[in-house]
Amino acid sequence: MEVNLLQYEQKYHNYIVAGVDEAGRGSLVGPVVASAVIIDKVDIISGIKDSKKLSKNKRDILYEQITSNYVWSTAIIEHTEIDDINILEATKKACTIAVANLSLKPEKILVDGNMKFSDVRFISIINGDNLSLSIAAASIIAKVTRDRLMLELSAEYPQYLWHKNYGYGTREHIEAINTHGLSSYHRKSFKFC
């Protein structure tokens, strides 16, 4: 059964609604990236869904369409700040900054997950990237942005295979850490590191 990805946008049809999602929260290395997107409820881009369910090629195409047609913003919190304030607070900060940087002020903010925000406009939706078109669009922007950053870092540290694992704890990545030690981009606060 296909889910109506506009159910939340329709529920809040009288409001300016932004969707927010992050990429990189579970990674061992690099930044966490959050994106906020306000979709055009009349001009819906076809094919938008949770970024994890799309091929890299399809994500790249949708990234260009979303960034060309919708209001969007991205915020990046670097690994050093993640180590200072913890990954949850860094993720919340990235989400808040992404929303603040939008050129339109949203009245309702749909965010993937179960995070709690002091700003009452935030509405946390578990599995939101599969339930809201705005959140799904934000997931695409966040993932493509972070993946591109990790490809740049991979050129500096090719031994960690970030061009394949994007900093996540794959077997090959763990083996590379055991062989080469930590890079300057690894999150030192993570238990593994």
Curated annotation (Swiss-Prot):
Q: What range(s) does the RNase H type-2 domain occupy?
A: 15-193
Entry's Gene Ontology molecular function annotations: manganese ion binding; RNA binding; RNA-DNA hybrid ribonuclease activity
Kindly give the InterPro entries that the UniProt entry links to this protein: RNase_HII (IPR022898), RNase_HII/HIII (IPR001352), RNase_HII/HIII_dom (IPR024567), RNaseH-like_sf (IPR012337), RNaseH_sf (IPR036397)
Q: Which GO biological-process labels does this protein carry? A: DNA replication, removal of RNA primer; mismatch repair
Q: Does Cytoplasm count among this protein's keywords?
A: yes
**EC numbers for this chain:** 3.1.26.4
Q: Which UniProt keywords apply?
A: Cytoplasm, Endonuclease, Hydrolase, Manganese, Metal-binding, Nuclease
Cite the binding residues for a divalent metal cation: 21-22, 112
Predominant location of this chain? cytoplasm
Question: What SUPFAM superfamilies does the entry give?
Answer: Ribonuclease H-like (SSF53098)
Q: Does the keyword Hydrolase apply?
A: yes
Q: Which CDD domains match?
A: RNase_HII_bacteria_HII_like
Question: How is this protein annotated for GO cellular component?
Answer: cytoplasm; ribonuclease H2 complex
Taken from the UniProt record, the cysteine pairs bridged by disulfide bonds within this chain are: none
Cofactor binding note from Swiss-Prot or TrEMBL: Manganese or magnesium. Binds 1 divalent metal ion per monomer in the absence of substrate. May bind a second metal ion after substrate binding.
User: What reaction gets catalysed by this protein?
Assistant: Endonucleolytic cleavage to 5'-phosphomonoester
Query: Where in or outside the cell is it found?
Result: Cytoplasm
Necessary cofactors: Mn(2+); Mg(2+)
| Lineage: superkingdom | Bacteria
Its family?
A: Belongs to the RNase HII family.
Q: What the protein does?
A: Endonuclease that specifically degrades the RNA of RNA-DNA hybrids.
What is the name of the protein in this document? Ribonuclease HII
Q: What is the lineage of its organism?
A: Bacteria, Pseudomonadati, Pseudomonadota, Alphaproteobacteria, Rickettsiales
Encoding gene per record: rnhB
